[in-house]
Amino acid sequence: MKHKLKTILFIGLALIALLGMTACPNAAGGGGDALADKTENVEGIQFTMKGIAAVTNGNVGHSDYSNPSSGGKNAPHTVSLSAYLIGETEVTQELYQAVMSNKPSSFNDNPESGEEQTKRPVERVSWYDCIAFCNKLSLKLGLEQCYTVTVGGNPIDFSTLAYNAIPAIDNADWNNTAFDGSKNGFRLPTEAEWEWAAKGGTDDKWAGTDTKSKLKNYAWYNANSGSKTHEVKKKKQPNGYDLYNMSGNVQEWCWDWYSASTPASGQTDPIGVEDGTFRIIRGGSWYDNEDKAACAYRNGNKPFDTSTSRGFRVVCRP
């Protein structure tokens, strides 16, 4: 079943792009000036947001993923993005609990030796759960909410929304979530933002490397994970933007509805098609092979679905 998406256009993002897209080329093309990182604290749990400079006509996609049969068509193309901040790591179990007062993860004990349980990525979260988390995190830090979910003509009050009120089955109201990218709160990355961050200023196939034999240094995937998640920011190297686990550990939800191919070259701050059945997931996981861990590999799942191999990270405006 297809669901119509109510989208609030990015207000003023074109102006942000014009002001922020100063030429400073890197291997992936189009990168702008450096953007400062930011560390936040919620209920004593710290997390870091890494600055990603605005980009003009940056290179995304990959020739290995030019056909739909290769995991959702994502041929080489260009995209322009306003500056943003993205989580240094996937959302951890401890941060999720601090915001949502809930621990949904299946990997909730027996961490790998030398790893801390609460710093493993949260999993078994739906796209709906991510929307609620983002708004609740924004409220806790005094920021504007990026998402509006309207039920019976009235917007949900996320400050009082109970965890068990988040739908566990397909829900038209949540599928029609309105997104305002001009707000300064937390949200899911768009597919384009996610891929640009994963590439880390390079044209590498995976986050951190272009060499298959070196992937083990950057990613937890089926060849080295031991069939479980691992503490974020532990034992693996970051990519060129100092982001951890953009390849592997858990798949990551994005904002966009899944479509058969990525947008054509030349778009600015694309947010995907207006409706669909599946929401985008990226990055591969502890369960997946190296092909699915590639920066350009695309997949999708129903927004109410959960999995032990799926989590998320957040973004926000500077």
Task: List PLM regions with ranges.
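Short, well-ordered junction/capping motifs at the entry into regular secondary structure
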Residues: 169-181, 216-247, 273, 299-304
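Bacterial N-terminal signal peptides that target proteins for export
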Residues: 2-11
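GGW-centered surface loops in extracellular recognition modules
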Residues: 31-53, 57, 183-186
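Surface-exposed recognition segments
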Residues: 73-77, 202-203, 225-228, 246-318
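Hydrophobic helical h-region of N-terminal Sec-dependent signal peptides
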Residues: 10-18
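Short, polar loop/linker segments at the starts of domains and inter-domain junctions
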Residues: 59-83, 100, 107-112, 228-235, ...
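Bacterial Sec-dependent N-terminal signal peptides
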Residues: 2-3, 17-43
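Active-site microenvironments of metalloenzymes and redox enzymes
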Residues: 62-67, 80-209, 258-260, 318
